[in-house]
From Swiss-Prot:
Mg(2+) binds at residues 254, 271. This is Virginiamycin B lyase. The keyword Transmembrane does not apply. It comes from the Bacteria.
Length: 280
């Protein structure tokens, strides 16, 4: 099954909700969209200039998202109830994920921090890492892993161990997207170097050439990862062995966020104004 829905406002990132729908940030319109299992689209205004960016399902059954434009974390229930939690001015939150501790963890691009927010809205700053932290994910080791877009490194944070950094071998790589896979590895994109990176928890960092400005990456439940090639209007599927298969999208699509839906299908946010479910 394939499905495409036109959604104005700059679809940027997606997350599967507990209600069986896909939830989408609309970075240009300051809104969140819901795409139901039947394809119906609902919109939930957030605020002008709020720039909703990354989104994650929380352990409380709500959707949590970063407001990069007005320094807030947003929470939206599946019934449409919106709550906001202010952060420091200029923090510019971007990446967000659910952690192993039942809280949400997020990056602050502007202030260079890693923050934590509990489901009842208590925020705390855990680390100042610099380097423009971008996306963040829960790792198979229950730490959070994040990309340092201007720091040319991958960071790992665990409340017990603190912060460690892995410098990338390619200079000026511009890492952005990051995900954890079922084979105990961390995968990440290098948008400025046209590469995909992989860090096994028990091995050395690896890099794979992947032209097309790779942006987001998501783990495939069947193994390997999918990557949005923002600069080439394509998607790539990369196996655990490094084999690459690409899929063309319409010209000017600007593919960004990727997420698997409750039905097991891959969904893609196209900043040009569409949300696409890839054919099975």
């Amino acid at each position: 099954m394939s499905l495409i829905r036109e959604i104005a406002g700059g679809p940027y990132a997606l997350a599967a909700g507990p209600d069986g729908a896909m939830w989408v940030t609309l970075v240009h319109d300051g809104a969140i969209a819901r795409v139901g299992a039947d394809g119906a689209v609902d919109r939930f205004p957030v605020a002008d200039g709020s720039r909703p960016s990354l989104i994650s399902a929380g352990p409380d059954g709500a959707l949590w998202f970063t407001r990069n434009g007005d320094d807030r974390i947003g929470r939206l229930t599946t019934a449409g109830e919106l709550t906001e939690f202010p952060l420091s001015e200029g923090s510019a939150p971007f990446g967000i994920c659910a952690g192993a501790d039942g809280a949400l963890w997020f990056t602050e691009m502007g202030s260079g921090g890693i923050g934590r927010i509990t489901v009842d809205g208590q925020t705390s700053g855990w680390a100042s890492v610099g380097g423009t932290p971008s996306m963040i994910t829960r790792g198979p080791d229950d730490a959070v892993w994040f990309t340092l877009n201007q720091g040319n490194a991958i960071g790992r944070l665990h409340p017990r161990d603190g912060v460690t950094m892995r410098e990338l071998p390619t200079r000026g790589a511009g890492p952005v997207g990051i995900t954890a896979t079922h084979d105990d590895a961390i995968w990440f994109t290098e948008i400025l170097a046209d590469k995909l990176g992989r860090i096994p928890l028990d091995g050395a960092l690896q890099e794979i050439d992947l032209p097309g400005k790779p942006h987001a990456v998501v783990a495939d439940p069947s193994g390997g990862v999918w990557v949005s090639l923002w600069g080439a209007d394509r998607l790539a599927r990369v196996s655990a062995d490094g084999d690459i298969e690409t899929f063309d999208l319409p010209p000017g699509s600007e593919p960004h966020g990727l997420a698997f839906g409750p039905d097991g299908g891959l969904w893609v946010a196209l900043e040009s104004g569409f949300v696409l479910r890839m054919p099975d």
